[in-house]
Every structure is written in structure tokens, then in C-alpha cells.
């Protein structure tokens, strides 16, 4: 189970790293819009 648990987080990390790029651009904008 330990070996299966490791590959899981590794696959989830790249998926989350690719999403933040698009989310950061949208959030940013939103954060700047809200801060303004």
C-alpha cells in the first residue's frame, strides 16, 4: 500500500501544478480587481 500511495501524490502534484498556472492568472486578476 505504501508503494501505491507514493505514485498517487506524484500524479496529483503535476496536475495541481498545471492548474495553478491558469488559476493564478485568473485569481490574480480577480485579486487585483478586488483590491482596486
UniProtKB/Swiss-Prot annotation:
Subcellular localization, as worded in the UniProt entry: Vacuole, Aleurone grain
The keyword Methyltransferase belongs to this UniProt entry's keyword annotation: no
GO molecular function annotations of the record: nutrient reservoir activity
Cellular component, GO annotation: aleurone grain; vacuole
Predominant location: other
Tagged with keyword Nucleotidyltransferase: no
Keyword vocabulary terms for this entry: Allergen, Seed storage protein, Storage protein, Vacuole
Stated family: Belongs to the gliadin/glutenin family.
Subunit structure as annotated in this protein's UniProt entry: Monomer.
Function: Seed storage protein. Serves as a source of nitrogen, carbon, and sulfur for the young developing seedling.
Protein known as: Avenin-A
Amino acid at each position: 500500500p505504501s508503494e501505491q500511495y507514493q505514485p498517487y501524490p506524484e500524479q496529483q502534484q503535476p496536475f495541481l501544478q498545471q492548474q495553478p498556472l491558469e488559476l493564478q492568472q485568473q485569481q490574480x486578476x480577480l485579486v487585483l480587481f478586488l483590491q482596486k
